[in-house]
Amino acid sequence: MNTAQLSIQQYIKAKDGNRPYLLDQAFASDAVLDMVVHTGSISFPPHVEGIGPIGDVLVRRFGQTFENVYTFCLGLPPEPQARTFQCKWLVGMSDKSSGEARVGCGVYEWQFSAESGLVERLTITIEHMKTLPASDVHCIMKWVSHLDYPWCHPEALVNNSPDIGTLEEVIQYVTADTAI
């Protein structure tokens, strides 16, 4: 049986590494994905049902557009038998076509099966998705590649963040002490 933490980690490994075959170690076959996007710089369908379509959206199509993907869950992982879990997240990546860097953040809301530990429902809220010039890719990748992965404390993230004005809203969001 999976644990909540392992299911989350397998999802991140699948998405970041463009490995859709790993999703069956993260999601139930009839899982549901809801996307809430509060930015115009990236788009996703608002509702997806089933592991196949979820894989198309979160791994296959995502992997066609982005590379050098690092996704972080901020804070401590869930308890092994957790039925629900919420955390802020941060992603750093680069666009395959333009070479531009992307840094985004938001909230994950997970619901897990009591029997299998697999994800039954995931709501991903995207609060910010910043686009930076290709000249910033190196410093963004240097930053994110040195963070604890995939579980990272917000303080560590901020202490090592590059001094780029475009990132201010992202840094403020992930460090804000607000209830999720």
Go through each PLM region and give its residues.
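Short, surface-exposed linear patches
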Residues: 54-57, 70, 93, 108-112
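Terminal "cap-and-tail" regions of soluble proteins that handle hydrophobic small molecules
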Residues: 2-9, 13-14, 92-103, 109-180
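Short, well-ordered alpha-helical segments enriched in acidic and aromatic residues
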Residues: 18-34
